[in-house]
C-alpha cells in the first residue's frame, strides 16, 4: 500500500513531467496534466498519438515521472520521482480524467495511464532530505 503522504502529494498536484526514451536511447520529456486514480494507483493523462512521447511509449512502455512543488524555501521542498509502465487508458480512466478536468469532455482524448513500480517522495517538511519510498515488489 502506498504511504498516505505520497498519495496526498500526488493528489494535490495536476502537472507531471513525463520522461520517455527513443529507440536509439535519446531521452525526452513532456509536461502533462494528470488525474490520479487512487484505487488502481495510476496516473492518467492525455497525449495525442502524433507526439514524440506517445510514439516512444508505444515502442517502450517504461517511463519516469517527476512531480515537484515549486518553492525557493528549502524547508518546503517536496517532489516525487516515479518509475512505471505506460499503457493505453480505458473508459474508466477517461471518466477519472474528465472528473478532474471537466473542460476536457468536449475534446477528443487519447488517454494514457502509468502504473508506478517505484515512487520516491522527498519531503523536507518531514525533515531535511527526508525520503519515503514505495516499491511494487515489496
Q: What are the language-model segments listed below?
A:
Residues 23, 50, 70, 119, ...:
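Residue-level signature for short turns and capping positions that connect secondary-structure elements
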Residues 1-17:
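Extreme N-terminal tail/first-helix region
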Residues 10-11, 58-59, 98:
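Alpha-helix boundary recognition
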Residues 47-51, 64-69, 92-103:
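Short acidic (Asp/Glu) patches
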Residues 14-49, 57, 63-68:
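Short beta-strand segments
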Residues 74-138:
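Charged, gly/pro-rich active-site loop segments
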Residues 53-84:
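Helix-adjacent hinge/juxtasegments
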